[in-house]
């Protein structure tokens, strides 16, 4: 797990709980019907705006946010330059043996098409389509989390209004008004917490993960195209390092 995510989640929730404890009895902030309404309705309302198949992927999306490792662009560039050196020294057909131990299917498919003599424009089109589909899947997952972040506060407000109506319908006991109002406001609190301490931060993190993977695969596409065109390995490296920030770019060139 990314330590930054772990620190962010644990730290945020600890601060929330600590603030609740400062307010007195923690029990006054717990109301099961309010929890069920906010959490349950925030999920069920997704069926209005998203296919059921997409909603089933929520656990997988969360797993990706928490456990997916950020790809190393530096290592990727080093690998692509290595393939360029092999292709220049032994011919592009020799890469067929070099990719047998590679786990990344995107790299394998791209280089295999180059080895097979596929038209360069077709290679780029196929790989770009694959990348576009990846972006679409990531956007779908991000959209689900953003929808939860949008609807949870609304569900909380609905719960608060229900509670207020119930409270105001019976004012025979003035002493119970304060307690009733407190319970009514809990759903608004829960909705705000779900949105701002869970769903929206996860959506932002998924967007960052997506951007990292898009950059990674874009470098692969450019690398495969450079290898296929027979570029000098040094030129391949210079082309690919343009995708890095200037500081990393210079550091990588010095290491090389």
Predicted regions and their residues:
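Large intracellular
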Residues: 4, 15-141, 213-256
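Membrane-entry signal-anchor segments at the cytosolic-membrane interface
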Residues: 1-7
